[in-house]
């Protein structure tokens, strides 16, 4: 709970800076890209953990009790009863987290990770053509997010087709 409280209570940009600029003060040197990956993993891990906790808690206790009554082990109950229902509940929120993370990758440019937004900034600074370039960057982000949204819809339909209500 402490990890989730700290990560959810601090901005991702601060987390990036602590990992990239702060860890060298205690002898841990990381290049920019691995530092960004670690920061994003810790950040998304906290949000996804809370999403999954909520999804698991949404499955009625009676479902577990019914599984025990028919002789299932805890692992069988989780795999065959609880997780399919929890996943159906969690997919929209997990997809939203993924979309948020895709958009947040622009923050990695603050620690010199060359990503989409930084590439747009470099081109705009070189050509002095700002609005069209930033609009193109926005369209690329929009396309990424649209693909994730479509995949989420397919996954939700697949889960619904299997009767996980």
What is each residue range found by the language model?
Residues 1-165:
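Transmembrane alpha-helices and adjacent helix-loop boundaries
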């Amino acid at each position: 709970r402490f990890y989730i409280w700290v990560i959810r209570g601090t901005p991702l940009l601060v987390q990036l800076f602590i990992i990239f600029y702060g860890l060298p003060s205690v002898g841990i040197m990381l290049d920019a890209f691995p530092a960004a990956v670690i920061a994003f993993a810790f950040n998304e891990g906290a949000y996804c953990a809370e999403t999954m906790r909520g999804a698991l808690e949404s499955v009625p206790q009676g479902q577990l009790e019914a599984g025990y009554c028919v002789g299932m082990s805890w692992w069988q109950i989780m795999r065959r009863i609880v997780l399919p229902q929890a996943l159906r509940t969690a997919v929209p929120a997990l997809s939203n987290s993924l979309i948020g993370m895709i958009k947040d990758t622009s923050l990695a440019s603050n620690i010199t990770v060359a990503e989409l937004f930084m590439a747009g900034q470099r081109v705009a600074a070189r050509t002095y053509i700002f609005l069209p370039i930033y609009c193109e960057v926005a369209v690329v982000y929009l396309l990424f997010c649209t693909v994730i949204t479509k995949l989420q819809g397919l996954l939700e339909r697949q889960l619904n087709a299997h009767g996980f209500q």
